[in-house]
Amino acid sequence: MKTTTINGTALDEPAIWLGCLSCYNNGRLNGKWITAEQATEPEAAETLNGLAKLETVNDYTASRCRKCFGDEFDVMDYQLIPKSCANAKEFYENAEQLAELHNTGELALLVILAGVLDPAGLMSLDELAEYHQNSYYGEHDTDKNFAEHYADEVGDTASVPEHMRNYIDYDYYAKELLYDFMSEAGHYWRNQ
């Protein structure tokens, strides 16, 4: 199992905590952590097993809480997923993609990007992944290091003689670049 760390907090894998809303409103926690990998399994519908039971009344089948017989379940908490996937429907629809992105290590970057670019959670996981793919410029210790790397990458320093490169003010260049880029936790993306 891969552990991802964001700002010093270790997150094992993408997951939601699905719980009974009635129990929650009455001060009791009755729920279960469901990981993206569990949600991709064929018996994903059974992940509420132990939390809920199926009950049929007048040809209507509903999931009922085993503790209070409430019939509403909701996501109470989530970890290592963008806000747009923090509801049960989106989580289950994107579970396979979330698990794959987590295994490649890209999911943590998408969570960071979503926090900066989309705090309201309006962008889909596909839109975030596309934005990341088209605009990511890597991880750097400081804005100055990013500016140096960017200048070398785009060839801004190619025409400057080697002995004159020490006179380039990369701190100022970094301030100018950050009008066109955004950064969070040492990662840089071009604004689109």
Show the residue positions of the predicted features.
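Structured domain cores in non-transmembrane regions
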Residues: 41-121
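N-terminal ordered "arm"
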Residues: 2-55
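Extracytoplasmic/secretory-pathway segments with low complexity and glycosylation-like composition
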Residues: 103-107, 111-154, 163, 172, ...
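Acidic, proline/glycine-rich low-complexity IDRs
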Residues: 4, 8-10, 23, 146-192
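Ordered hydrophobic segments in well-structured contexts
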Residues: 14-19, 31-35, 67, 72-76, ...
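Residue-level signal for secondary-structure boundary elements
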Residues: 26, 56-60, 103-106, 125, ...
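Conserved aromatic
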Residues: 38, 140-141, 167
